[in-house]
Design a protein with these regions (language model features):
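Arg/Lys-rich amphipathic alpha helix in sigma70-family domain 2
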Residues: 78-85, 95-116, 124
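Sigma70-family region 2
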Residues: 34-35, 58, 62, 71-88, ...
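Short, aromatic/basic-enriched loop-to-helix "N-cap" motif that marks the start
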Residues: 67, 81-95, 167
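DNA-recognition helix of helix-turn-helix
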Residues: 98, 102, 151, 157, ...
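Short, charged helix-capping/linker segments at alpha-helix termini
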Residues: 18-19, 34-42, 53-71, 162, ...
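A short pre-motif secondary-structure segment
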Residues: 145-149
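C-terminal edge and immediately downstream basic/flexible tail or linker adjoining helix-turn-helix-like DNA-binding
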Residues: 1-14, 32, 130-133, 161-164, ...
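A short, charge-rich alpha-helical start-of-domain segment used by transcription regulators
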Residues: 30-54, 131, 143
Length: 191
């Protein structure tokens, strides 16, 4: 069936939907927070806390993660006005989390760290802790994506959207990271 002249004049062009596309939720929330809406920041926290938690879990002792998550979001709240592009909130807060993890290690070099293995007596917790330690020993490029996938339960596209990595990079990092993790688990278990 062909379109008539009347249909063409009264119908909405196919590209019009693209032009009127609403901004992403984080853009709306960042703008709302900058205008004084504190509930908007609570929603940003709910959206991005798993990302920050996963980044930290890949880099710092588990006992420190919750405090650092709170510290990072407090810092982000105070510095939100410096964010140039509201759509970049995810990569921006991910960068803050990575930097805070580096800062944590700088500060903790002079202090004695509590061994995570001493806190959990359950066999399941012990095995999970061993695997987490193996993940932490992987190259940084794989560590973060594996923790976000395996611990935080994010999908590949979610990891890409929240970290600023491309979907292809996430897939490659997950594939290579899992391959290395399997090799290390096999070596650890004598397979």
């Amino acid at each position: 069936m062909y379109a008539t002249a009347d249909m063409l004049l009264t119908s909405t062009p196919a590209h019009a939907a693209e032009q009127t596309q609403e901004p992403a939720i984080e853009v709306v929330l960042v703008r709302a927070v900058l205008e004084g809406d504190r509930d908007g920041f609570a929603r940003l926290y709910d959206l991005y806390a798993p990302l920050v938690h996963g980044i930290l879990l890949a880099r710092v002792p588990r006992i420190e993660v919750d405090d650092l998550v709170q510290d990072i979001f407090l810092h982000a709240f105070k510095k939100l006005h410096t964010l140039r592009d509201a759509a970049a909130f995810g990569p921006w807060i991910a960068m803050i989390a990575r930097n805070r993890a580096v800062d944590f290690h700088r500060r903790s070099k002079e202090t004695v760290e509590i061994n995570d293995d001493l806190r959990g007596s359950d066999a399941h917790d012990s095995r999970a802790q061993e695997i987490l330690e193996l993940i932490r020993s992987l190259p940084e490029a794989y560590r973060e994506t594996l923790v976000l996938r395996l611990v935080e339960g994010m999908t590949g596209p979610e990891i890409a959207a929240r970290t600023g990595l491309t979907a292809a990079s996430v897939r490659v990092n997950l594939h290579r990271g899992m391959k290395l993790l399997r090799q290390q688990l096999g070596f650890m278990e004598g397979l």
